[in-house]
């Protein structure tokens, strides 16, 4: 590899290069990104597609004096490489290493913490107005990409920005993809002559469409945008996965998230785990339910791939609805389906469900509609980090009246939970983690629908301590209790409503450890304490869960161990509680 990229320590070095050197810089950036993702994994496709665009941005604008705000962060590995982080990129997504997305605490060149989509325009307009009020100079650029024009927040920002007359620059990295192909009318409109009329009608000067891999054309368009005194949209057409044949050949996601892998002799070599994931297992039981009952439909906000729904979409094309990166719409659309007699299952990540909290309350729970929420990535998600942790769903959903909140311990729990939820006259949540399925403990049955309440995994004849768990932590609790006399293990299974009889029995053991992979503030442990207080039950209780902090990226297994949420940690907590001490 040439030494060109090794001489780039900041964007000023990009501006100092002769223009004829920029194509080589782009080539080296792609080689670095492919190599990095091969070693540690990551969001490959969007970053490869945005290489020329990011080089052109740093050629024309002067970061950090000019603020560059990227939507999501999927597309930003070249930006990281050009802003002084190349020597640490091998730590990408690892504990203590480079963040998976963008974070201003990592670099002054990251003007916006970006992990969720559709935030860049609103934030950029705020930055521009704030700078104007403070008398600060400098340009502000919002870079949209990976489906940013399928979400409502972007249009709220465009509406406000177009009416403001402020010189906001919006760069649309149009690769026709979010994770998979974009859906709906807007992405189709962008590839027509009406795109100009659309943006000009919103009050923007429209520049484009520009070939997003033609550096001279990009630089000309960005310089024109920089010189404008009013809002501008630069529309760049790019190819997600450009420069890496396996990504370009991947028609579903264009190499959205890949690695680790090896690229040898023109061939991609990847190790593939044979274990089934919770997502795949849930998709299978949902497929069975859809085959049995034509009223059952699936809804997802741009998560066909992530929630393992592609096979369902192929089998039931008219009953699987990908609505784009539009979580609020997904929930209210599901409410409408339910009100018309369908049985919608809204498949959504825990972290993205946060974006539709009002719709859950107002549009689903208040009218009492039987929507089922399949909440994927509940708990720790590992390398995707703080913006994607699923550690707040129990605490936020538990207070909602008549919403039943299920959490499977093993894959065998999914079918009876879904059957129970589909038969219920109210809303239900089935929350399951990222990762592979644990084995069903010996002698344990999953039960049959309708499920009712908690499940004893281990019941001591003379109990002196009970481990109460939610989800797969029951497996660790069983291991922790093995060989400990008088220890019981209760899988709460449903965080709301509680199985009061089982939990009060647990409390009468005198010592209770409640373990959950989520915040303890308002979570299952809080619910258990509320129950004990209401019944005047005096037990020693220890709550185990996430700290009062945002959990960063890292290995989820290590993070569980750090919080005592493995077998050894739970055993240690139980023994300390019995001894009357702390941790």
From Swiss-Prot:
GO terms for biological process: 1-deoxy-D-xylulose 5-phosphate biosynthetic process; isopentenyl diphosphate biosynthetic process, methylerythritol 4-phosphate pathway; terpenoid biosynthetic process; thiamine biosynthetic process. Its EC number is 2.2.1.7. It catalyses: D-glyceraldehyde 3-phosphate + pyruvate + H(+) = 1-deoxy-D-xylulose 5-phosphate + CO2. Mg(2+) binds at residues 146, 175. Binds 1 Mg(2+) ion per subunit. The keyword Metal-binding applies. Its cofactor is Mg(2+); thiamine diphosphate. Belongs to the transketolase family. DXPS subfamily. Homodimer. Catalyzes the acyloin condensation reaction between C atoms 2 and 3 of pyruvate and glyceraldehyde 3-phosphate to yield 1-deoxy-D-xylulose-5-phosphate (DXP). This is 1-deoxy-D-xylulose-5-phosphate synthase. The lineage of its organism: Bacteria, Pseudomonadati, Myxococcota, Myxococcia, Myxococcales.
């Amino acid at each position: 590899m040439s030494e060109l990229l090794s001489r780039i320590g900041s964007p000023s070095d990009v501006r100092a290069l002769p223009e004829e050197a920029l194509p080589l810089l782009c080539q080296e950036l792609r080689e670095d990104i492919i190599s990095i993702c091969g070693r540690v994994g990551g969001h490959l496709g969007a970053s490869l597609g945005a290489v020329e665009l990011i080089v052109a941005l740093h050629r024309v604008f002067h970061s950090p004096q000019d603020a560059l705000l990227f939507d999501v962060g999927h597309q930003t590995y070249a930006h990281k490489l050009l802003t002084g982080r190349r020597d640490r990129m091998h730590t990408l997504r690892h504990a203590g290493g480079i963040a998976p997305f963008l974070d201003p605490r990592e670099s002054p060149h990251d003007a916006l913490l970006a992990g969720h989509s559709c935030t860049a325009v609103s934030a950029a307009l705020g930055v521009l107005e704030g700078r104007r009020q403070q008398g600060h100079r400098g340009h502000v650029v919002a870079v949209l990409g990976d489906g940013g024009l399928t979400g409502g927040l972007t249009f709220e920002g465009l509406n406000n920005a177009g009416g403001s007359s402020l010189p906001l620059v919006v760069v649309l990295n149009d690769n026709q993809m979010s994770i998979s192909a974009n859906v709906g009318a807007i992405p189709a409109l962008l590839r027509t002559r009406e795109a100009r009329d659309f943006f000009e009608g919103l009050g923007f000067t429209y520049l484009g469409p520009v070939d997003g891999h033609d550096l001279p054309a990009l630089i000309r368009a960005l310089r024109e945008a920089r010189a404008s005194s009013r809002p501008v949209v630069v529309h760049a057409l790019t190819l997600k996965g450009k420069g890496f044949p396996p990504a370009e050949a991947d028609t579903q996601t264009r190499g959205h998230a890949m690695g680790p892998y090896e690229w040898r002799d023109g061939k991609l070599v990847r190790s593939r785990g044979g274990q089934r994931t919770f997502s795949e297992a849930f998709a299978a039981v949902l497929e069975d339910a859809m085959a049995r009952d034509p009223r059952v439909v699936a809804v997802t906000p741009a998560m066909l791939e992530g929630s393992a729904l592609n096979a369902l979409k192929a089998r039931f094309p008219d009953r699987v609805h990908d609505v784009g990166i539009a979580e609020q719409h997904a929930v209210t659309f599901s409410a409408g389906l339910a009100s018309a007699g369908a049985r919608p299952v809204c498949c959504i990540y825990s972290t993205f469900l946060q974006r539709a909290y009002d719709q859950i309350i107002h549009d689903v729970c208040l009218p009492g509609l039987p929507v089922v929420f399949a909440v994927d990535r509940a708990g720790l998600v590992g390398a995707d980090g703080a913006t994607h942790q699923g550690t707040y769903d129990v605490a936020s959903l538990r207070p909602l009246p008549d919403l039943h909140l299920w959490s499977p311990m093993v894959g065998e729990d999914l079918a009876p939970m879904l059957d129970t939820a589909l038969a219920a006259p109210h809303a239900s949540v089935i929350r399951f983690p990222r990762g592979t399925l644990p084995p069903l403990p010996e002698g344990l049955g999953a039960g049959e629908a309708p499920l009712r309440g908690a499940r004893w995994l281990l019941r001591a004849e003379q109990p002196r301590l009970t481990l109460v768990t939610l989800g797969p932590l029951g497996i660790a609790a069983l291991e922790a209790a093995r060989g400990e006399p008088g220890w019981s293990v209760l899988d709460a299974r449903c965080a709301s409503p509680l199985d009061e009889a089982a939990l009060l029995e647990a409390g009468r053991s005198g010592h209770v450890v409640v373990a959950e992979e989520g915040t303890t503030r308002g979570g299952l442990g809080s619910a258990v304490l509320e129950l004990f207080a209401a019944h005047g039950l005096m037990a020693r209780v220890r709550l185990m869960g996430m700290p009062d902090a945002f959990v960063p990226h890292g290995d989820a297994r290590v993070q569980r161990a750090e919080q005592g949420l493995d077998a050894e940690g739970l055993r240690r907590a139980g023994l300390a509680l019995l001894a009357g001490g702390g941790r």
